[in-house]
């Protein structure tokens, strides 16, 4: 499973990219608005940090303007995935951009039927929102299972399931178990994946035991084993 971070905070992106665990970035108008930065400049900087797909969303809702914005965003860098809403206009733009060789992320997916439409429109990614479905009393992960099952039945569908609106580590692990291709999550959720009380407890014990030895690994010379190797 690929891990994307859902943020427009450049400092957070740099920090997580340094771990070597980050495969891409997703942004949306709300996240960008919080930064107060010019959108195109910000996306360009993110693309300099992350070599994987960087989703940049159009702001318009009509097909003509969305297409113009999508083409403009696609010129920023080869790894830009233009993000469009799952509407008739959005899917029309998706098909055109896909035919032109641009990656497209179709967002705001809330049903398996919508996911089928996104795949038929040539989307590189479809983004079903699990957390928002949970919020209205549905089980968002059930949608992931449906989409993965349908896509698996049709090898011609090359669209990747990009699980969005992730709220906790369980959303991540269950999405992986179901076979989703990508999980995009806020930085806080990525950091929660590292955490386990037994890891902390075990590390504290190892550190305490090592300190009792009074040793320093870096002060110890590597033994000369050249003679042994020849033997």
Curated annotation (Swiss-Prot):
Q: Which NCBIfam families match?
A: fsa_talC_mipB (TIGR00875)
Report the enzyme's class at the first EC level.
Answer: transferase
Q: What is its EC number?
A: 2.2.1.2
Q: Specify the protein name.
A: Probable transaldolase
Question: What reaction gets catalysed by this protein?
Answer: D-sedoheptulose 7-phosphate + D-glyceraldehyde 3-phosphate = D-erythrose 4-phosphate + beta-D-fructose 6-phosphate
Source organism superkingdom? Bacteria
Q: Which Pfam families match?
A: TAL_FSA
- Pathway participation: Carbohydrate degradation; pentose phosphate pathway; D-glyceraldehyde 3-phosphate and beta-D-fructose 6-phosphate from D-ribose 5-phosphate and D-xylulose 5-phosphate (non-oxidative stage): step 2/3
Q: Which SUPFAM superfamilies match?
A: Aldolase
Looking at the keywords, is Cell cycle present? Answer: no
GO cellular component, alphabetical, reads: cytoplasm
Coiled-coil spans in chain: none
**Keywords per UniProt:** Cytoplasm, Pentose shunt, Schiff base, Transferase
What is any one GO biological process for this UniProt entry?
A: pentose-phosphate shunt
Q: What InterPro entries is this protein classified in? A: Aldolase_TIM (IPR013785), TAL/FSA (IPR001585), Transaldolase_3B (IPR022999), Transaldolase_3B/F6P_aldolase (IPR004731), Transaldolase_AS (IPR018225), TSA/FSA_arc/bac (IPR033919)
Subcellular localization(s) per the UniProt record: Cytoplasm
The active site annotation covers: 83
- Where mainly located? cytoplasm
Q: What's the stated role of this polypeptide? A: Transaldolase is important for the balance of metabolites in the pentose-phosphate pathway.
Drop me one GO molecular function for this one. transaldolase activity
Q: Which family does it belong to?
A: Belongs to the transaldolase family. Type 3B subfamily.
By its UniProt entry, which Gene3D superfamilies does this protein fall under?
A: Aldolase class I
Tagged with keyword Transferase? yes
């Amino acid at each position: 499973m690929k891990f994307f971070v859902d943020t427009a905070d450049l400092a957070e992106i740099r920090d997580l990219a340094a771990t070597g665990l980050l495969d891409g970035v997703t942004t949306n108008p709300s996240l960008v608005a919080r930064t107060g930065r010019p959108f195109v400049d910000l996306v360009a900087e993110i693309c300099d940090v992350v070599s994987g797909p960087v989703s940049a969303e159009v702001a318009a809702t009509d097909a003509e303007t969305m297409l113009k914005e999508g083409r403009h965003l696609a010129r920023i860098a080869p790894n830009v995935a233009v993000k469009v809403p799952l509407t008739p206009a959005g899917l029309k733009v998706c098909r055109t951009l896909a035919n032109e060789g641009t990656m497209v992320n179709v967002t705001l997916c809330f049903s398996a039927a919508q996911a089928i439409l996104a795949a038929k429109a040539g989307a590189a990614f479809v983004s079903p929102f699990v957390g928002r479905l949970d919020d209205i009393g549905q089980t968002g992960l059930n949608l992931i299972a449906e989409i993965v099952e349908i896509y698996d039945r049709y090898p011609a569908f090359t669209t990747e399931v990009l699980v969005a609106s992730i709220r906790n580590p369980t959303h991540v692990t269950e999405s992986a178990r179901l076979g989703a291709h990508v999980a995009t999550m806020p930085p806080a959720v990525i950091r929660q994946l590292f955490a386990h009380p037994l890891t902390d407890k075990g590390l504290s014990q190892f550190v305490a035991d090592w300190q009792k030895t009074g040793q320093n690994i870096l002060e110890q010379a590597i033994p000369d084993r050249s003679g042994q190797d020849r033997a």
